[in-house]
């Protein structure tokens, strides 16, 4: 029985260690990421809203988030290239 407990407890400890390591890796990747997690979803939502009013190619939309270290300010920048032909109102 003692031998069985030894092997069972070893598996539990190993899985806990693996889980902890994975959590550390994920948290480090999030810290090092310059782009917030919500930015891709925000870009998709903006494209949907803009497409309601004009014909727009998704590739002409540029979304960027800058971080100013001096004042700890985040700046959200949105650039859209509107072709002259596609300024037709869709409503």
From Swiss-Prot:
Q: Which domain of life is it from?
A: Bacteria
UniProt keyword terms in alphabetical order: Cell cycle, Cell division
Q: Which InterPro entries match?
A: MinE, MinE_sf
A GO term (biological process) for this protein? cell division
Q: Name one Pfam family in it.
A: MinE
Q: Which family does it belong to?
A: Belongs to the MinE family.
Function comment: Prevents the cell division inhibition by proteins MinC and MinD at internal division sites while permitting inhibition at polar sites. This ensures cell division at the proper site by restricting the formation of a division septum at the midpoint of the long axis of the cell.
Could you tell me what this protein is called? Cell division topological specificity factor
What species is given as this protein's source?
A: Wigglesworthia glossinidia brevipalpis
